Amino acid sequence: MLAIGITGSYASGKTFILDYLAEKGYKTFCADRCIKELYQDLSVQTQILKLLPELESFNIGKISNLIYNNDLAREKLQNFIYPLLIDKLILFKKENANSKFGFAEIPLLYEAKFDKYFDFVVTIYCSEEIRMQRAITRTSFDIEIYNKIKEIQLSQESKIAKADFAINSGVDMLDLEKQIEKLILVIARKL
């Protein structure tokens, strides 16, 4: 299986494109959904509370607030959760070894050095204005966290420069589908 990593800035359209690929029958993996599942595990919750005692109780909102305002807390959580995420990603790749392609959405792919797990990387991008419009429609939107995420992540330009392919999600659906079709043609040549 050719492993394709999908990355991009916050609200750039990564999940939309991943879901589109899943609808087309491709195997997909979403890091954010995987982490949400891990957070449901009581043993994971217990470990996080031990690592971050300032939380007092397990609450996703409090975790977000803490890790985006405290570099040490973010590093502790990442050092704990990333190995679990890598295990799930490796399992996804093993379970889908007979598929031609597997797409995995990893928001912090470069920042977390996950690019080494992929044969090909795609960056999804759009204008800052469009990203902000998308972000404010989310129920969990918080402008302070949005700005902290922007500080932590590599710039869109850096992600595009590092990627093997880039998709502009700030276009109409027809143009977006054409870009995805081109991506499939490009990666099919790698087989």
Swiss-Prot record:
PROSITE patterns: DPCK. Pfam families: CoaE. GO terms for molecular function: ATP binding; dephospho-CoA kinase activity. The keyword ATP-binding applies. ATP binds at A11, S12, G13, K14, T15, F16. InterPro entries: Depp_CoAkinase, P-loop_NTPase. Its main location: cytoplasm. Coiled coil: none annotated. The keyword Transmembrane does not apply. Pathway: Cofactor biosynthesis; coenzyme A biosynthesis; CoA from (R)-pantothenate: step 5/5. Keywords: ATP-binding, Coenzyme A biosynthesis, Cytoplasm, Kinase, Nucleotide-binding, Transferase. It catalyses: 3'-dephospho-CoA + ATP = ADP + CoA + H(+). Belongs to the CoaE family. This is Dephospho-CoA kinase. It comes from Rickettsia felis (strain ATCC VR-1525 / URRWXCal2).
